[in-house]
Amino acid sequence: MQIQVHTLSRIAASVLLASVAAHASAAGTVVLDTYPLGQDPFGWPSRVFADDSGRQDIAVPFTLTSATSVQSILTSLDGLGGVTLGILASQGSTPVGGAWLYSTHLTDPVMDTTLSPTGWSLGAGTYWLAAVADTGFAGQWQSGTEDYSGDWAQADANGWSAVTSTFIGMPAARITVAAAVAVPEPGTYALMLAGGLLVAALARRKSNARQQG
């Protein structure tokens, strides 16, 4: 009898672990990745700057198929001074300027540094990850490769415009968002119910054994 109880306990534990795994959220989902293999950008470095001669800001688009939140952002942005990195809404082939959905201010950003924002929740749609220079910032956002991987955008004092050249790769960026929680299949629900009943039966059996002892 003792062996049978131990066997049932192991079965119950296995079923419960399976139910927990079914409810666990999956790892984050990458929705934009313009980095090359090995995460070492080697494409054209596009300037990000603002000084007396003018300015240039850079943005890359990404699309979400469902509501989610941003887990991490990796870019090749690098430079000296202050710059704002954040999310802008989309209007046609360019970002909507001047209205940050979310942003963070960086000082002397270093290439390939990961940011982990909190509370950056977005609905389904197309957005832009943008770097907008403070006055005096001098830096660059290097393309991941020299191969065309899609249009992006740049801005001067007159606003945003699309970059459609097939000779320049998109600036390197990787955006990871929270994945949807896995929904158990009907068979998994049955296993969870069976596991719960089995645990209850084991508890009753142990209670009866103590009372008889």
PLM feature segments, named:
Residues 1-6, 210-213:
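N-terminal secretory signal peptides that target proteins for export/translocation
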Residues 4-24:
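Gram-negative bacterial Sec-dependent N-terminal signal peptides
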Residues 27-39, 46-47, 56-60, 80, ...:
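PGST-rich, cysteine-poor low-complexity/disordered linker and tail segments that act as flexible spacers
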Residues 52-64, 112-115:
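Short beta-strands within extracellular/lumenal beta-sheet-rich domains
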Residues 65-72:
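Extended extracellular/luminal ectodomain segments enriched in beta-structured repeat modules
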Residues 76-158:
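Aromatic- and Gly/Pro-enriched, solvent-exposed loop/edge beta-strand patches characteristic
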Residues 184-203:
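A short, hydrophobic C-terminal helix/tail in secreted or cell-surface proteins
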Residues 200-213:
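C-terminal membrane-anchoring or membrane-association module
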